[in-house]
């Protein structure tokens, strides 16, 4: 996987099985990691796709964690996003999605997460902890999947309603700075200045990073409403449009542009953390 934002089709419509396999081969894996015991029941991600289709949801994104050289890529964590067949073009520039996260190496349970997709910036949004459910890898647990799916789908309108409330709230500069500082702190240690003599080695965000997080990439993102500001910050933090500072063991300070998040697990963690910053 090169980058999560490239794990969708260019037109953001439904994906074919061949397109899914090209981006996330673990979705169609038939085996589990050899280290796992018989108590671990493999829940094949591909088996969930027809169930999602029965509820009108089609796959629109497939992403997979990169594996180390000796690890089997068919067992690593992966993500599928699903959207309603009649809502692939969205309304108001945003469509709701159901995200399915799974692995076959024992590193995670099956997770269903409420989410959304914003077309103008191709941002995938993952709702916070109160909007997701888990399914453990045990025998017969797949029978509970539909109950979890219905529970997740019921939460989707609340996500879109929250966005509407955010659009009605205007933020002043101090509020924007506070939100951006909280956001960058989800990825990097935040300090007012890295030029302290006793600063430990590491990657740090500072006031310049806040400015980068708030920066606008397109005219559609110009605005002071909560939703627009939050989306600017989310895009910049997830995609690495933020300059940070690296402090070496010799206390040298080097400025570097951050990288996009390529880990599926980290993408979900930071994305959920950003969602949890929303207070209306």
What is the predicted role of each segment?
Residues 1-8, 86-95, 103-280:
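Intrinsically disordered, low-complexity regions enriched in serine/threonine
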Residues 1-43, 54, 71, 274-280:
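Intrinsically disordered, low-complexity regulatory segments
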